[in-house]
Amino acid sequence: MGNTRKKVSVIGAGFTGATTAFLIAQKELADVVLVDIPQLENPTKGKALDMLEASPVQGFDAKITGTSNYEDTAGSDIVVITAGIARKPGMSRDDLVSTNEKIMRSVTQEIVKYSPDSIIVVLTNPVDAMTYAVYKESGFPKERVIGQSGVLDTARFRTFVAEELNLSVKDVTGFVLGGHGDDMVPLVRYSYAGGIPLETLIPKERIDAIVERTRKGGGEIVNLLGNGSAYYAPAASLTEMVEAILKDQRRVLPTIAYLEGEYGYEGIYLGVPTIVGGNGLEQIIELELTDYERAQLNKSVESVKNVMKVLS
């Protein structure tokens, strides 16, 4: 029998990339190649070896390799991009754009060269614009270039709702639309706890507070850490997307997808409900929006477009 093991490459061996690599290996979803720049090759190899040495204790079989050589990523089923400079306190997302766009373009050229059939999942911020940059640089079909923010934003929303109601997070579902920023749109109407609409369980002013905290969720953690940004929940969110693709689960997940007329928008990457499976983006789900939700989404789209203007 030939080698049927799946292969996932994670570009960027910082906190998020390394945690993602570990979670993917731990769940035995695939063998993992962790990649960073040549100056960081030894620390990257060290992290990979450290994870590998956890495998007998955790009881997982997966190869984990650290490298700065993209040849090692050849034939990846999925490539996850977490590389880029991090956002520091007081730094706007737009400050990140030019630097991270250059990184996206160079990384994407390597992905196209060594894994031309891969599906790319982008996490690097500002993620809507960075996913667009990767899509344009790769020449891949839109189904094979998707961004992660909605799974994370929705996870934050679900966490805060579960805390508010003192319920299991497993029983809370929700959806967050739009860009990954202060203008994201948590769709409360489509959010439930144990199948019961949230609006019947939580007073409006508490829901509004939860929505606001969700919007500021990334910033809250940046401020608490004082140095760096969230990585456990982002890595868990990436891993959920990777699992949905590798196992062809056809999960309904909010992802950053390329719109061609859906929701009335054209030629833009935006967070929308999607079906994620073996081909990557299987389908975009169009929800009926109220005038208020539509206005909020328009505002979110304008924010994304303003960031995209900075792209070369």
Curated annotation (Swiss-Prot):
Q: Which UniProt keywords apply?
A: NAD, Oxidoreductase, Phosphoprotein, Tricarboxylic acid cycle
EC code(s) of this entry: 1.1.1.37
GO cellular component terms, A-Z: cytoplasm
Top-level EC class: oxidoreductase
InterPro entries per UniProt? L-lactate/malate_DH, Lactate/malate_DH_C, Lactate/malate_DH_N, Lactate_DH/Glyco_Ohase_4_C, Malate_DH_type3, NAD(P)-bd_dom_sf
> What residues bind substrate, as annotated?
R87, R93, N125, R156
List ligand-binding residues for NAD(+): G12, A13, G14, F15, T16, G17, D36, N100, L123, T124, N125
Q: Which residues form a coiled coil?
A: none
Active site feature: H180 (proton acceptor)
PTM Phosphoserine: at which residues? S149
Single GO molecular function: L-malate dehydrogenase (NAD+) activity
Query: What CDD domains does this protein map onto?
Result: LDH-like_MDH
Report the record's Gene Ontology biological process terms: carboxylic acid metabolic process; tricarboxylic acid cycle
Query: NCBIfam families from the xrefs?
Result: MalateDH_bact, PRK06223.1
Name-wise, this protein is: Malate dehydrogenase
> From which organism does this entry originate?
Bacillus subtilis (strain 168)
Gene symbol? Answer: mdh
